[in-house]
Each structure stands twice: as structure tokens, then as C-alpha cells.
């Protein structure tokens, strides 16, 4: 099957022949050029065995950045929520955050990806959030936490179990979901972002990471593709930081720094073609150091389809393998509904 050639990261690789590192403004232009094409390509031949509810406002301010979609297997959607819960039939909930370098992207490009996961026996919540550089990481995590609060309050109506959550995302969205998982377990990180976690730590049963930015130390390595302004834009506006202070501040953006033995199991997918390959390998190793169960699917360079965030494109056999492994992962970590025999 033909290699993935339409995404922003192959463009970024080519741009690096002219630029030592890709700056934020160049990234935003590249994303603008590919986003509409990705939305069409990734959603060809919609999944019909899933019920779709689009653009639910999880904050109440009418912003598109504060909308989410819910996708439920038809077998559950056609049954009243009360009946499903009474039979102990509520499903685990997979809450997903899209990527886009924190500056771009939209949940609409992930509709079919999310539907394919719903087919695996889960309710899927597909979340938008505010983007940098207008908003910093504190705002993004505030949105993500608000989305979880909405899930806790409302997901039973869609057949989901708010006590069996799996968080996930790709690229920047993976970093958001990983930080949110850490915030549920690390009070000092929650305090840093002035957040009261919307979900008890024990209700987050697992974490899914697709080509995620989980170790920010790679931004400071020679030859990394993205400029340090990606780090700066995620921090609150301050006087310019020295390199040492910028690296210290990046620790609060870097999920790897907040891992411990209490972390839930993780499913990681990456490849040697992924710009965050080293970041993901470091994350896997740190999880293993802490004794956290981790299922890692890592493709070699020879797998030409596996450019950064290939998982969104259902046409690739490598994506189908991700989906099979993800379904099994959720089934293994979610556990039975409360009160089930």
C-alpha cells in the first residue's frame, strides 16, 4: 500500500532541508494546507454501526473549541441508558484528544478513527480544545479537565461508565491526555496548573498514546525537528527565559517527569519514522522502570505507512493492527462495570 504522503510531518521533514528547525509559524502554515484534506481522507466510507452525536458544548460558552462528539455502538445507543445500566451493560469510555502541534487540528478529522474504536465495545468522546499560541498549556488543560467533568456528569446517558475511563490522544493530544492522567494522581502537578481533577485517579483505567510528545527533553537535543518556540508558546507569557530555566519550566509540560508506580497501564504506538520516536522510547523505558504495565507497538523505518500519526488513516494495515491492539487493551484494563457479576 502507498506510503502516507499527505500529512504535515513529511512536509516538516522536507522543510528541514532549508531550516535548521521548523518554527511555529511554518508549522501552522503547513497544518492549514493539509487539515482539510486530512478531514476528507480520514473519514471516507463512514462507519454505519455507530451512533454519532456531534458538537456537544462541554463548557457552555458556544465556542467550537469547547465542543465534543460522542460515538456509541448502535447496539447500546438503541437501548435506553437506564436499561443498559440496570443490566450492568454500560461500556468503558475512551476520551480522545486530537493532535496538531498544539496550534492546529480539530476533532472532525478523527471521526472515523473514533468510530473504529467504538466498534471495539466502548463509548468514545472526541474532544476539541483551545489552541496555542493564543492560549497556553494551563488553558488547554483547563479545557481537558472540563471535558472530563462533562463526561462524569453525562456519559451514562450514552451508555458509558464514568468510573471506567481510558484517556488517549495523538502527538500533542497524547501529551494532553498523559498530563491529565498525571494530574489525577500528582497533587503538586494539579496545583501547578490550579486544577481540581474532575475524575478520581482510580477511575482512569488506562492511557493510549499515538506518536505522542511525552518527553520534552527531545526539544533540547541537537537536530530535533521542532523549534524551542513550541515549548515557549505553551508557557504563560513571562520575561524571556534562559535555556536552563526554559528546560526546567518544560518539566511541567513533560509527562515522563510525572510517572510513578501508581500510573495506570499504557498502550504506546510509534515508529522509527515518527518525529517523537525517541520521546516514546524514553517514555516506554521509564514506565517499565516504574513497573507500570505497558503494551508497545513500534514499527521499523521499513514500514513506509507509519509516518507521524499514521494511526488516523484506517486504510493502512498498520492502523488496523493498532485498532485490534487498542480494543484488546481497553478490554483488559477497563474491568467489569460496577456491580457486575
What is the predicted role of each segment?
Residues 2-341:
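Alpha/beta-hydrolase superfamily serine-hydrolase fold, recognizing
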Amino acid at each position: 500500500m502507498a506510503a502516507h504522503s499527505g500529512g504535515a510531518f513529511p512536509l516538516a521533514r522536507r522543510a528541514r532541508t532549508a531550516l535548521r528547525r521548523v518554527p511555529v509559524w511554518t508549522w501552522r502554515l503547513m497544518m492549514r494546507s493539509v487539515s482539510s484534506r486530512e478531514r476528507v481522507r480520514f473519514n471516507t466510507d463512514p462507519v454505519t454501526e455507530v451512533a454519532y452525536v456531534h458538537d456537544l458544548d462541554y463548557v457552555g460558552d458556544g465556542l467550537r473549541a469547547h465542543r465534543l462528539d460522542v460515538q456509541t455502538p448502535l447496539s447500546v445507543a438503541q437501548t435506553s441508558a437506564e436499561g443498559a445500566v440496570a443490566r450492568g451493560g454500560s461500556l468503558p469510555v475512551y476520551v480522545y484528544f486530537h493532535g496538531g502541534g498544539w496550534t492546529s487540528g480539530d476533532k472532525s478529522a478523527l471521526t472515523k478513527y473514533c468510530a473504529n474504536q467504538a466498534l471495539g465495545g466502548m463509548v468514545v468522546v472526541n474532544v476539541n480544545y483551545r489552541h496555542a499560541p493564543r492560549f497556553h498549556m494551563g488553558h488547554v488543560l483547563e479545557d481537558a479537565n472540563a471535558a472530563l467533568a462533562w463526561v462524569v456528569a453525562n456519559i451514562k446517558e450514552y451508555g458509558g461508565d464514568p468510573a471506567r475511563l481510558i484517556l488517549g490522544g495523538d502527538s500533542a493530544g497524547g501529551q494532553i491526555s498523559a498530563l491529565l492522567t498525571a494530574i489525577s494522581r500528582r497533587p503538586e502537578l494539579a496545583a501547578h496548573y490550579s486544577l481540581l481533577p474532575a475524575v478520581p485517579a482510580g477511575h482512569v483505567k488506562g492511557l493510549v498514546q499515538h506518536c505522542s510528545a511525552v518527553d520534552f527533553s527531545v526539544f533540547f537535543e541537537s537536530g530535533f525537528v521542532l523549534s524551542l518556540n513550541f515549548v515557549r508558546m505553551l508557557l504563560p507569557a513571562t520575561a524571556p527565559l534562559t535555556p536552563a530555566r526554559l528546560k526546567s519550566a518544560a518539566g511541567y509540560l513533560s509527562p515522563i517527569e510525572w510517572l510513578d508506580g501508581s500510573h495506570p497501564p499504557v498502550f504506546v504506538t510509534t515508529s522509527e519514522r515518527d518525529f517523537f520516536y525517541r520521546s516514546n522510547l524514553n517514555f516506554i523505558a521509564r514506565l517499565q522502570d516504574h513497573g507500570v504495565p505497558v503494551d508497545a507497538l513500534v514499527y521499523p523505518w521499513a514500514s513506509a505507512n507509519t509516518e507521524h500519526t499514521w494511526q488516523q488513516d484506517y486504510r493502512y494495515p498498520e492502523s488496523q493492527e493498532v485498532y485490534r491492539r487498542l480494543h484488546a487493551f481497553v478490554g483488559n484494563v477497563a474491568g467489569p462495570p460496577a456491580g457486575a457479576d
